[in-house]
Amino acid sequence: MFVNFKKIQSYIAYDLYDNNKIREFVDSLKQEELDNYIIYQFEVDDATLLQLEKEELELTQLVQEQYIDKKDFSFLNNHHLWIKYQDQDFIVNEIKNPENNNNNNNNNFYLNCFTIKGTENEIKKELNLNDNDNEINTYATFSITRYHFKMPQKIDLYIDCVINYDNNQNGNNNNNNNNNNNNNKNKFSLYGHVKCQAKDYSELLLFYILYNQPKPLKPNIINYLLSLKNNDNNNNDKTNPINKLQSPISNETILQTPKVFDEDPLFKFIQKGENSQNSSSNSSFCSIN
């Protein structure tokens, strides 16, 4: 599958603790002809926010994402393909877990991700994906505010803020309207991404030190969606729990790892018009979440 398509290869790092392991890993990539990238996804906590206040916000994006698959999730299960619309762009990511390769000495360090490059029609033809097919299912839809920060040229940094709607589903129906209004507050989950070309991994390690060694984001949004699907299959429940992630997103089903805030701690940057600008262009990152 996708034999004749160009692929952008990225490695989602699970940790940055072992410098020697990273050096060996980067040296192994030098034998490949592809442009290789390393992406570190991390939790955003109070210490991270304090450090971000020292940085200059470059631009802010509003990103809408929709994940699609067959109703039996055959693209995920059989081909490890994550298919989504990100704004108006059609994106297909192929995930390969190196833990399945016994010859790999870097187990538990990274997740291998290929972004398939081609037109929407070309890729859909390759996948035999028909828009009119009743078997196609949009199983996750949500909006993200993406904050890009101005960093050294060798690394890219952005923070994603997912609006986490609290619909007071567990509240008492006998509460008065004022109590309901107080309880129905939006929540915000933050998680960060920093990316560099593999040859510039030392810049990534410098970021890691300056930002107080932020914890890796495990599980990420993709693994979380997959775990929901697997739990659904194990329980033989005909109601797919992934559908709970349809916007608005409930407080109980959004990412488990990121800290949840009562208000968007980065929103104040939007008020700095000289440091931020709206952009409808798509991110250059290999996005898997």
Curated annotation (Swiss-Prot):
Source species, domain of life: Eukaryota
Put simply, this protein is called Uncharacterized protein DDB_G0267862
